[in-house]
């Protein structure tokens, strides 16, 4: 039968069996007929495919036709003039800022007290755990007045002393040895004894009824914080007012203060603010050297640069809280670059911030851009860089250098820099309890591998360091624009430097350091 299926035997060579495979009657046509049919079918398929492809050509990307929402000029304008926060306190809307009192801007919740006989370990724990910028020292828990402060600059000076990196001058040797005797006998080391060996800056107080004008003039002269007291209650402390809080307040409410608001769109180079002298350290230098530098110069932060003076990071006195654990001992002898990686790692683990902090502006930045960045990063100063300078220009940067900031005439001058401290015979202390150094036990200096300063992409990160602009510079500008006559900030800088250098000097031997913290807990 024509319709009957033929069966083709296919031999399975693997097992020798025969498998029947059905084949339709159409397959029984002659080979030439089948070949012609297949060619026609294939030709029709190709025709259909090409026609289909022509109809289904990939459409153009909408992004190619979409116009940018902001022009380059608009983006630059937004960078130069960032919008201030909209959540302005209605209590200050429409008011003359010169009539607002500092008592309205402080809170008793900011006050953290310790007593003169509080132990150094307890005070350090409190400073770190409460995240307070400063502790107020009083005579007794019942007193409402203060006799001193304890902050991270004091903690830095104390750690240098405990690690044997500094020693007192001759006039302070007797109280220093008395402190060492207390340590040997296992007694608590009170704050008043430690403060006697450190920097002794006078307390600056202002009444709560003082206007912001008084605060601007005081801060513009280089004072970093004031103790706010209630003159009606025998000088009872009611708050702490700082440079940062004032700058933040004026920025957030600037639209209500025309005298200040008109300054924000202007460029740093035109305003003539900033310091031509800037302290920096090469990233390959040891961490202990930058701690000594901050202590001897009386400053709270130092720019870290690569071999061509490009800014690659920032180390401040606040970062010393990462050095109060026993596991932190080797960091003192590791490089500054390595410590910056530790800072960023700790910030990511504790605060969930994994971005690289931005601590620089350039002479072409507006005051608004500068202040917005200061407020956003909670910084006290920003490094001024020249982003157009080639990374290969200039010789390798020494550990202590200064740059020239191309600002307008008559910029704020800073005094010449004092020579950097040197050290010899540095002992290796051991920290047996969370925040208290104890006797050295000869731990070797373990240097962790880190990227050398010569290999850092500093030119792409920032630019060549040429100056610094601080909260003091900005408030000094506000004071002068308001018709005030603030003191020269250079005088306060010199006073802090003299206070630091007269209190401690660089160690030449580790003998006293070994005696100071000879007890174990």
UniProtKB/Swiss-Prot annotation:
Keywords: CBS domain, Cytoplasm, Nucleus, Repeat
GO cellular component: cytoplasm; nucleus
Domain CBS: 106-171, 199-256, 274-331, 335-391
Gene Ontology terms: biological process: cellular response to glucose starvation; regulation of mitotic metaphase/anaphase transition
Ranges annotated as biased composition (Low complexity): 21-41
This protein's record includes keyword Repeat: yes
Pfam families: CBS (PF00571)
GO MF, any single term: protein serine/threonine phosphatase inhibitor activity
Record InterPro entries: AMPK_gamma/SDS23_families, CBS_dom, CBS_dom_sf, Ssd23
Subcellular location, principal: cytoplasm
Positions with biased composition (Pro residues): 413-422
Biased composition (Polar residues): 1-18
Key word Repeat present: yes
Annotated localization: Cytoplasm; Nucleus
PROSITE patterns: CBS (PS51371)
Function according to Swiss-Prot or TrEMBL: Involved in DNA replication and cell separation.
Family, as annotated: Belongs to the SDS23 family.
Protein name, as recorded: Protein sds23
